[in-house]
Amino acid sequence: YICLARPGASNQTIMRTLLDNIANLDKDDIVILNWTWINRWDFYNLQEEKWSTVRPASNEATEFDKLYYKYFQSELWDKLETLKSMYLANSILNSYGIKFVQTSIDDLVFNTEDHPPDYILALQNSLNNDILYFGNKGFYAWAKDNNFPMSKGVGHPLEKAHKEAYEHANKKFTQS
């Protein structure tokens, strides 16, 4: 069991972490991707030469964060980009023959109440069978409802919840 999760990471960070580690995986490994809130995004900061994450709940909101959420952020774009990352991960892991499951903290990813465009529905439908739920809950709601330790501030589920999520996901492969 190896946990590569990082509090506050975006879905783009999750995707880059998978790509950075895909060559080190073998067919006996099980990958669990716990996708985060759809409104967290990365950009490459040329001045600092590193990736930076914008997120609405940040206590350290920069001017860039404020401008981004005021003028550019939209639920439709967030949902599309998140679903694209999930689909890319699905495709890559399948092409490598790696067993995997995906969970999502954010219910908005698969929400269809706002009559999403057909391209959103197509991605949602292609991924729906690969999403692991904990009962009828996503990872975050399950961890919170089961009183797992959470980080201070934004309340990210800590290592114990990630380990239990792995055990839950592992049952999918050992019982099939």
Regions found by a protein language model. Give the residues of each.
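A short beta-strand-loop structural module common to alpha/beta enzyme folds
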Residues: 1-13
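Alpha-helical cap/lid subdomain in secreted, periplasmic
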Residues: 16-176
